[in-house]
Structures are given as structure tokens and as C-alpha cells.
A protein has these predicted regions:
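Class I SAM-dependent methyltransferase SAM-binding "motif I" and its flanking Rossmann-like core
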Residues: 88-145
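Conserved helicase motor
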Residues: 49-55, 128-130
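Short glycine-rich anion-binding loops that position phosphate/pyrophosphate groups of nucleotides
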Residues: 5-6, 76-80, 155-157, 215-217
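Glycine-rich, flexible N-terminal cofactor/catalytic loop recognition
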Residues: 1-51
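Short active-site oxyanion
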Residues: 19-25, 98-100, 148-149
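A contiguous loop/helix-start segment that scaffolds small-molecule binding in enzyme catalytic cores
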Residues: 69-70, 148, 152-222
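Glycine/small-residue-rich loop that forms an oxyanion/phosphate-binding "nest" at active or ligand-binding sites
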Residues: 50, 58-107
Length: 222
């Protein structure tokens, strides 16, 4: 189930109604999710489900599903299974014969893409690049991609990532999106080289979305 990526008003009526009716909510971070649930007076039982406890939690959630009860899966922000372990839970639900139903809503991937000004006809979502092993190879595989490439990145690695993309892919149109849908939303458009110059003197906080275009002279920002 999708939840807001920043602005708490970006949740659907259907999502609120479903969260109130299910037997259990599996949340990536219960502390952050409780803020959303409190806003909409949702008192459903909630447990944590994240990368480091997913295998233990799968067993507990499986028991709930086998009792013919519904479980809602939510992430910190946006759509589950996009760069988080909800994929494993979806697979397990399918294996035990439960119906899997997506309740759509906010997604940082699509919000950043449509507001970036880069081509939207084809895109590749890379998520977070590996911190070390396989990182360079993963970028090299994108050299000939005829699509907009979308990355998630932590602020403390953003400069390094932009620099490495510039070194391997060459200079291309690129965009940084941060704080999407929030009060201080910021979208910085330019090229990999111009973004690198900005990052030499500016530090962002939190997670950012980084978009890189194919190398096409018609796409560059003026």
C-alpha cells in the first residue's frame, strides 16, 4: 500500500479505509508510520517489517495470512517493494495462496520523473547503487541506455555518485530532486558536471532522487 512521500495529505481515501479494516499493518518503521496513522485516527495493530528482521517477521505475517486475515504493508514513504524488502513478503503471500492487491498512490520515482523535465517515454529505475562491490560495473552497464535513469541516493554519498556517473557516462543532462511534496521541495536541473560543481559547495540532507538522461543534444537544459 502506497503512503505519502512527504505531505501527509497525499494519501487516498481507499488507503485510509483499508488501513482501518485490516487485521495487521506491517510497517518499515513503526515510529514514522505512527505519525501517519495518528493523523487519520487509525488504531490497527502494527508490527515492524524491515531489511534486518524480514525473515523472522515473515513467519508471523504468514500465520496471520493463513488465518484468512488481511495484512497491509507500508514503507516509510511511497510504494512498498521499491528499494525495500516488501518484495519478499509479496512472494510469501503468493506462495501461501493469499490474494495480493496493490493500493496505488505516491511514489518518489514517478514524482521526480514527471517533474524533472527529462524524457518520460522510457526510464530505468536503478534504486541505490552498491556502496562498493559491483558499483562501477553497474554504472558501466548503463552507458548505452536509451532512457532516463533514476537513482535513489543518500546525501552523504550523493557527491561521490554524481562524480562517478560523470566519469563513466560522460556529461549528460541530470536532475536532483529532494524533499518532494514537502515545504522545502527542491529540484536542481543541469548536467552532471554542473551538479558536481553545486555539490562542491552545498550539502543536502536526507535521501535524494538523482535522474540522468541519455546523451541527446535536444534534452540539455538551456
Amino acid at each position: 500500500m502506497s503512503t505519502p512521500i512527504g505531505n501527509l495529505e497525499d494519501i487516498t481515501y481507499r488507503a485510509v479505509d483499508t488501513l482501518k479494516k485490516v487485521e495487521l499493518i506491517a510497517a518499515e518503521d513503526t515510529r514514522r508510520s505512527r505519525i501517519l496513522l495518528s493523523r487519520y485516527d487509525i488504531n490497527t495493530k502494527m508490527i515492524s517489517y524491515y531489511e534486518h528482521n524480514k525473515y523472522q517477521r515473515l513467519l508471523k505475517i504468514e500465520k496471520v495470512l493463513k488465518n484468512d486475515c488481511d495484512v497491509a504493508v507500508i514503507t516509510d514513504a511511497g510504494t512498498p517493494a521499491i528499494s525495500d524488502p516488501a518484495y519478499k513478503l509479496v512472494r510469501r503471500a503468493i506462495e501461501v495462496g493469499s490474494k495480493v492487491e496493490a493500493i496505488p498512490g505516491a511514489s518518489a520515482v514517478l514524482a521526480s520523473l514527471v517533474s524533472s523535465g527529462l524524457p518520460t517515454d522510457r526510464f530505468i529505475f536503478e534504486g541505490f547503487l552498491p556502496p562498493k562491490k559491483g558499483r562501477k560495473k553497474r554504472i558501466e552497464n548503463l552507458i548505452d541506455a536509451e532512457a532516463t535513469i533514476i537513482f535513489y541516493e543518500n546525501s552523504n554519498r550523493l557527491k561521490r555518485t554524481v562524480k562517478q556517473l560523470h566519469e563513466i557516462l560522460g556529461d549528460r543532462p541530470a536532475v536532483i530532486c529532494r524533499e518532494l511534496t514537502k515545504l522545502y521541495e527542491e529540484i536542481v536541473r543541469g548536467t552532471l558536471s554542473s551538479l558536481l560543481e553545486i555539490l562542491e559547495n552545498k550539502t543536502y540532507k536526507g535521501e535524494c532522487v538523482l535522474l540522468v538522461s541519455k546523451d541527446d543534444k535536444n534534452i540539455y537544459f538551456e
